[in-house]
């Protein structure tokens, strides 16, 4: 007998089935951690609420993690969101700069600037309802920060998740939309190493008596106010 190789053709329904599957994946893609928040005008005012829900979900999912929120122009609104949405079992680190924002440049001389407003928001920490989370705010040199990110690692330092933000959360939806892009797991270790190097070189630099970074707020240094006894 004689064997013959090849000559097999798929049944007619096979390519059609693949075509349908691919089309369904395009129309109904698997839900990712990425988000797009339109401006308030383009979302009938809903995008701000959706953003708050997204942040709340991130903080609750990582309720006992170490979370770094990096924003060169962090404002008091961001601190308020951390306090409202953060958990008491996580550690939060805000990394920002003391660079003047565009709003600062148009303020009157006697008006508080961005950083002053931020610290004023922290001044009532552990006073009543405000300030239930463990928070540090690190100010680094202007040139060290550009991107806005939220980076999450476990208590033992293992990277868990990361998100790149197209603009500042506190300004999101006012004039520009906000795109949140998950950082791929194979890239996250490099991002953490980059941020750790910024902290190490500016806050703990060996042999430099004039370190350019400083912790401008640490909730651990604030003692809770004693409540009056009836």
Question: What residues fall within each predicted segment?
Answer:
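PLD/PLD-like phosphodiesterase catalytic module centered on the HKD motif
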Residues: 1-48, 56, 61, 73, ...
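Structural motif
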Residues: 66-68, 161
């Amino acid at each position: 007998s004689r064997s013959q190789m090849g000559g097999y053709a798929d049944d007619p329904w096979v390519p059609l089935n693949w075509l349908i599957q691919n089309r369904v994946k395009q129309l109904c893609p698997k839900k990712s951690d990425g988000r797009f928040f339109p401006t308030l005008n383009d979302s009938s005012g809903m995008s701000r609420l959706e953003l708050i829900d997204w942040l709340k979900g991130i903080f609750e999912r990582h309720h006992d993690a170490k979370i770094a929120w990096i924003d060169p122009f962090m404002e008091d609104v961001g601190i308020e969101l951390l306090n409202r949405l953060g958990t008491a079992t996580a550690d939060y680190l805000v990394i920002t700069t003391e660079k003047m924002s565009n709003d600062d440049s148009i303020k009157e001389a006697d008006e508080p600037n961005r950083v002053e407003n931020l610290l004023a928001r922290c001044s009532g920490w552990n006073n009543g309802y405000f300030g239930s989370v463990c928070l540090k705010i690190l100010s680094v040199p202007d040139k060290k920060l550009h991107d806005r990110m939220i980076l999450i690692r476990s208590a033992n330092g293992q990277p868990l998740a990361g998100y790149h933000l197209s603009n500042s959360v506190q300004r999101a939806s006012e004039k520009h939309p906000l795109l949140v892009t998950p950082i791929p797991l194979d890239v996250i270790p490099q991002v953490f190493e980059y941020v750790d190097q910024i902290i190490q070189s500016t806050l703990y630099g060996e042999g430099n008596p004039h370190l350019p970074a400083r912790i401008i707020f640490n909730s651990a240094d604030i003692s809770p106010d004693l409540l009056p006894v009836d």
